[in-house]
Amino acid sequence: MTREDEQLKRWAQYFNDLLNRPPPPDLPIIPEASAELNVNCGKPSKIEIVRSIKMLKSGKAAGPDNIPPESLKADPELSADILYGLLGKIWEEEKMPQDWNESYIVKLPKKGDRRECKNYRGISLMSAVGNVLNRIILLRLQGAVDATLRDQQAGFRKDHSCIDQIATLRIIIEQSIEWNTSLYVNFIDFEKAFDSLDRSVLWCLTRHYGIPGKFIRIIKNSYDKMTCRVLHASGLSASFTVNTGVKQGCLMAPFLFLLAMDWIMKETTREQRNGIQWNLLEQLEDLEFADDIALVSSNNQQMQDKTARLTANSIKLGLHPNVSKTKVMKVNCTNNRPVKVRDTILEEVTSFVYLGSVVSIDGGSDEDIKVRINKARVAFNMLRKVWSSHVISRRTKFRIFNTNVKAILLYGSETWRTTKQTSQKLQSFVNECLRRILKISWTDRVTNEMLWELAGEEPIIAQISKRKWRWIGHILRTPANNITRQALRWNPQGKRKRGRPRNSWRRGVESQTRNWGHTWDTLGRLAQDRTRWRTEVVNGLCSNRS
């Protein structure tokens, strides 16, 4: 298609089909909670409105009402005075303005052929004023609902991150290898998960988790008669209704989606022991970050049973595993029987990109470091005009380098098991970048130490060490039942092989701990004081490159 009007119609048809899925064939019976959550159900106060306005993110495109967040944030108190009556009326009548139920879909390209619609993600541009009310609802509900969610879920939750899940999985793989125990990992991928969730089931889930009826009716009203228009080139498509999924771009969407994922995994693991032994009484069944699920089991049959249960439970909510992207990793396994989703055999892999980081069957991070260097090099080369510019100051160039190149390079470095060889590769790349920014030729007699001083940089291994121990301090401050914190001391039931144990991330951390004259217990007490931890460990011991 070459004509813009034809392309616009095609995009509208694609998103119309995507956002209006058929209902699940077998709707689940989900009981209501015995009591509603104890949260404030009164109409929004001016203090809440001001707080929500201040929390709006700047730089976001305006929705159909053409009101950018900056216009509200310019004077939060005045904006709150204007909105107070409107939001109070909405709260009492439980009806959203029709304009708030319309959104514009902006297409963002993903991997793959950009000539195919399926390789784009749609993000909804919504009313900034509507997001003020959504934020108030979210702040009231989030804490109470969060306390009921499974500990394995780290997505969209306070004090949790991708790094926590990546580190936990790496430790599980490394310890399984060291203790010679079998481990099966199934990386589940869903097809268009946020767009496929059945809404009739979603409202049942909100009652199941005890959300008060006032909130449910207001949220449901914002989804009823919801319409979208697709932005393409310089035009807008015709309006169409949306009946499935949560609004991508809405503040409430991740919160609502977590209810669905939590129910699926609770039903999947209910009265089952198909995970790995985590402590004397509990098994670890999976690690989750929103819809990115890594099932773990100690034998093939357990993994097959759990995969089948997850598939059946997710289909009841309108979600379907993507069999072409769902992969299985086997560590220390002699059983060659495949794991299936329905009748489709899942591909077995020796490495997998989990939450943006490459996790390998040997537990190492060499492959991930190689990928990080390549991605950072691409990012650096894309900014070549910045580095060669005579207008941009050197200070600004280094700020751009840190935020756009080094951030890519060091993503997940907290979990890396670095070696002398990988450290040299990382440092060589950084040195190459610094020399290009500073316009220092290799023929110039400038040592690496002089280069780092000119750039205000530390050696890369020191930077990685600081990031690692800063993150470890955060983990040691979490509750004792935190899964990542427990992983720091977890050992599977098995027997080590004869000979010297291989190096691992955790063994390296424990070695550093002993060299500093500490134990996990003393580090745990030290970490409770953030200032002392930052001064003595992150900026003290790590800077000494111990």
What annotation goes with each model-predicted range?
Residues 1-119, 124, 128-132, 149, ...:
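Surface-exposed loop/turn segments and immediately adjacent short secondary-structure elements
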Residues 63, 102-105, 121, 153-155, ...:
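Catalytic palm active-site di-aspartate
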Residues 77, 118-149, 167, 243-273:
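Conserved pre-motif C helix in the palm subdomain of viral-like polymerases
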